[in-house]
Amino acid sequence: LQIIIMVLFNVKELYISWFVGAEAVVDYQIYYKLIGMIGGLFSLALNPVWSAVTKALVEKKEQWIRGLYRKGIGLIALFGLAQLVLVAVMPMVVKLWLGENAIEVSRVAGLLFCVYNLVYMWMMLNYNFACGMGRTKVISIWLTVAGAGNLLLTMWGCSVYRSWITVVVATAVAAI
């Protein structure tokens, strides 16, 4: 399962390099390092969830599982708001970070990256709960289809738009 998730979410740089051009990876990395860090923190916070859900399921604590899931959704909403604040100040942050080498920040690309990141966090929350409940077969089929869909959407989208953000959007759409 970890390999399937890696293929779905960690091949964007490779796809950008193949379908858009290696120079576009630099722009993607700036957005990823700033906005993607929020999804990374959320994913890190999920580390104990899988085993906690398994334990609660064995102990027949369905209400506790539902409550934990609602808290996860609430955390996604909170992180989503943090992303919006980050997108608002991102031009200033990038200029401070990179100085005169700074890229021109696109708020549209930033917002699309936020949507991708929300989908990523939602998917990781559901992944951890599904695995904790022993639904690994269902999740592995779903992730495999999403991985194939991601490649197809990326190929089509980049043939039309030739932008790194197309790869990010394709990944979000495929993961839904």
Task: List each language-model region with its residue ranges.
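Helix-loop junctions and terminal segments of transmembrane helices
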Residues: 35, 39-60, 69, 129-132
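Membrane-interface helix-loop junctions in multi-pass transport and translocation proteins
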Residues: 134-137, 144-176
